[in-house]
């Protein structure tokens, strides 16, 4: 089990979530099969979203930090920290805000669309 950051569709809804990367947790949390949006430059933080879902997903009302600020995401966003061996490691909301505190907005991904 590893802690990750879940950015739900609702504005400002950012939380810690504990997941099993090799189990069905990714499917359950993303509400479908997952795909990668990308990785923040100079970090080991990868960004995932739902690729295919049987559920009705909504546009995520939160903005990611640069260079992903303009990325339009349907459904939840999951941030996973990977170590130098590409193994997932704990990453919390507090870690996320510390990492991106130099961004222009007070809360890097809580600004409405």
Locations of the language-model features?
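Domain-length accessory/inserted modules outside core catalytic folds
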Residues: 1-113
């Amino acid at each position: 089990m590893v802690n990750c950051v879940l950015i739900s569709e609702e504005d400002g809804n950012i939380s810690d979530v504990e997941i099993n990367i090799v189990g069905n947790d990714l499917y359950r949390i993303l509400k479908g099969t997952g795909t990668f949006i990308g990785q923040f430059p100079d970090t080991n933080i990868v960004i995932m979203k739902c690729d295919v879902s049987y559920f009705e997903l909504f546009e995520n009302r939160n903005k990611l930090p640069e260079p992903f600020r303009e990325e339009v995401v349907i459904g939840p966003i999951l941030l996973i920290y990977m170590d130098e061996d590409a193994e997932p490691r704990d990453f919390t909301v507090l870690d996320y805000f510390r990492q991106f505190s130099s961004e222009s907005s007070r809360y890097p991904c809580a600004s409405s669309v």
